[in-house]
Amino acid sequence: MTRHLLTAADLSRDEATAILDDADRFSQALIGREVKKLPTLRGRTVITMFYENSTRTRVSFEVAGKWMSADVINVSASGSSVAKGESLRDTALTLRAAGADALIIRHPASGAAQQLAEWTAAEAGAPSVINAGDGTHEHPTQALLDALTLRQRLGGIEGRRVVIVGDVLHSRVARSNVLLLHTLGAEVVLVAPPTLLPVGVRQWPVTVSHDLDAELPAADAVLMLRVQAERMNGGFFPSAREYSVRYGLSDKRQALLPDSAVVLHPGPMLRGMEISSSVADSSQSAVLQQVSNGVHVRMAVLFHLLVGAEQEAISA
């Protein structure tokens, strides 16, 4: 596996499967432990750099590092020299000089994680960089935790039909999921209004549809995306109500799904817009399972980058 995780395209099928397998092993290793600590990353320093708001991703990376006995340090724009005008490059070089083993970055600019990896590259002692979401580009660990959730719920991913619904244009989650699910052998369908699909989307390894009702009966899983109004400068649809009527997963639409189908959402959810509260809280919803899996997947990613897949994943 490469030294960084910048995009889901970095992962081969074997590498992705190894991470998912180790995530399951970490989950099992922690069951029944009064103190949730493994010595896997003892003596390692993990620094999180979050320049956008986050709850699930930031907390799960922090928990993952601490459960593996790493020293985890949080750097935010408001609490660092960034607030004084320091550039991302100078911040990155400072953290490398301070001895960071891993830098986990979330940033509003697409390509920020790649830049960070290039800036901190060195012949020896360069930190591993993990992309925790860069603008509208990618979010590879979210795709991994979604894949783990699907594998647990469905028994496998190969040949499964996954329908991704909503604001694909602004969604780094959608991009990473398309790449990873394709790598793992799933069939991916994108459902969105034409205004919320990227240019060139028909060259992606997906089927594109604008009719959600037509796609639900054959779906093994549905991944609902939030409308990212904070990234929109104009009108992408007539109204929130009309969007919800056409592309929201309502109780009525849930009835179109097979009983075995799984409902995913990367969060945060806009209940009543892209998903109803009753669907979000139903037995088909795997939203909280996704959160739990996020910790275990990020443990596995840190292990693969910092320790190496050739070593035993779990030390009792």
Curated annotation (Swiss-Prot):
One Pfam family it belongs to: OTCace
GO biological process, one term: 'de novo' pyrimidine nucleobase biosynthetic process
List of residues binding L-aspartate: K84, R172, R226
Alphabetical UniProt keywords: Pyrimidine biosynthesis, Transferase
Top-level division of the source organism's lineage: Bacteria
GO MF term list: amino acid binding; aspartate carbamoyltransferase activity
Catalyzed reactions: carbamoyl phosphate + L-aspartate = N-carbamoyl-L-aspartate + phosphate + H(+)
Pathway: Pyrimidine metabolism; UMP biosynthesis via de novo pathway; (S)-dihydroorotate from bicarbonate: step 2/3
Keyword Transferase: yes
EC number: 2.1.3.2
Binding site for carbamoyl phosphate: R56, T57, R106, H139, Q142, G267, P268
GO cellular component terms listed in the entry, alphabetical order: cytosol
Family: Belongs to the aspartate/ornithine carbamoyltransferase superfamily. ATCase family.
PANTHER family the record matches: ASPARTATE CARBAMOYLTRANSFERASE (PTHR45753:SF6), ORNITHINE CARBAMOYLTRANSFERASE, MITOCHONDRIAL (PTHR45753)
Described function: Catalyzes the condensation of carbamoyl phosphate and aspartate to form carbamoyl aspartate and inorganic phosphate, the committed step in the de novo pyrimidine nucleotide biosynthesis pathway.
Summary of subunit composition and partner proteins: Heterododecamer (2C3:3R2) of six catalytic PyrB chains organized as two trimers (C3), and six regulatory PyrI chains organized as three dimers (R2).
Protein name: Aspartate carbamoyltransferase catalytic subunit
Organismal lineage: Bacteria, Bacillati, Actinomycetota, Actinomycetes, Mycobacteriales
